[in-house]
Design a protein with these regions (language model features):
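Glycine-rich, N-terminal phosphate-binding loop of Rossmann-like dinucleotide-binding domains
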Residues: 9, 51, 89, 192-193
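Beta1/beta-strand and adjacent pyrophosphate-binding region of the FAD-binding site
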Residues: 1-12, 28
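Flavin-dependent oxidoreductases
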Residues: 15, 171-173, 181-234
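Glycine-rich FAD pyrophosphate-binding loop
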Residues: 21-41
Length: 234
């Protein structure tokens, strides 16, 4: 019997396991593979604070960034980049950046002028620019390295038990059934991403969930190392 069962070893599952283990709970993680294979390791690894809505979203993003800093120190995950440039190529995007800067409660953000970005090594590659908003609050990790490293640390140092190759067939109140065993816990968290559609199709339909895709393109290196990520309009 466990205190917590987490199904899925992507970032959402790892986050639940991290907090549960830090609170002293006995944690079991289950997944069909030995490490995350989906969006957790295919995405950019941004921890984005700037632009979040005030209310619940912004404090949550600020707290998430603080937690990631703690995780990076404890686990030994490198923070690849800090801060961010939000680049506006159109007048409409420039207006959005200025409106955000005027209305946001976040401190430390500022608009950069041509004299600022043209001195940067990447300046010649940016094309025609209207404005750039600089934020010091963002973080970026390498998810292909950081996600497996966090799982390994949880198993080796936080007492988390991990069962790979565990295909969850059915779930109920306080239990999870796989072909080889039935596991019980006080709390069960399903962090399956779009695999939830196969396990609990009625839940998927009830919330009218839809699968989405993100298109990414890896470029040939241009010989420039950026201190911070850049996010641009089209």
């Amino acid at each position: 019997h466990y205190d917590v069962i987490v199904v899925g070893v992507g970032i959402l599952g790892l986050a639940h396991a991290w907090h549960a283990a830090r609170m002293g709970y006995k944690v079991l993680m289950l997944d069909t593979t030995a490490s995350a294979q989906g969006a957790s390791v295919r995405n950019f690894g941004f921890v984005t604070v700037t632009g979040q809505r005030p209310g619940e979203d912004l404090p949550m993003a600020v707290r998430s960034a603080a937690i990631w800093k703690e995780v990076s120190e404890v686990v030994g995950i490198s923070i690849e980049q800090t801060g961010a440039w939000f680049v506006a190529h159109s007048a409409a995007s420039e207006a959005v950046l200025k409106a955000y800067l005027k209305e946001s409660s976040m401190t430390g953000c500022c608009l950069l002028g041509p004299e600022d970005w043209k001195q940067q090594p990447v300046g010649p590659f940016l094309g025609e620019i209207q404005a750039i908003l600089h934020s010091p609050h963002e973080l970026r990790i390498n998810p292909r390295e950081g996600i497996p490293k966090l799982l390994q640390w949880l198993c080796e140092h936080a007492g988390v038990h991990f069962e790979p190759s565990a295909h969850v067939q059915t779930v109920g109140d306080g239990w999870v059934q796989t072909p080889g065993a039935c596991y019980q816990a006080d709390h069960v968290f399903l962090c399956l991403g779009d695999r939830l559609q196969a396990l609990l199709p009625e839940v998927w339909r009830a919330f009218d969930l839809r699968r989405c895709m993100l298109q990414m393109l890896r470029l040939e290196p241009i010989g420039v190392r950026l201190d911070h990520p850049m996010l641009t309009d089209l």
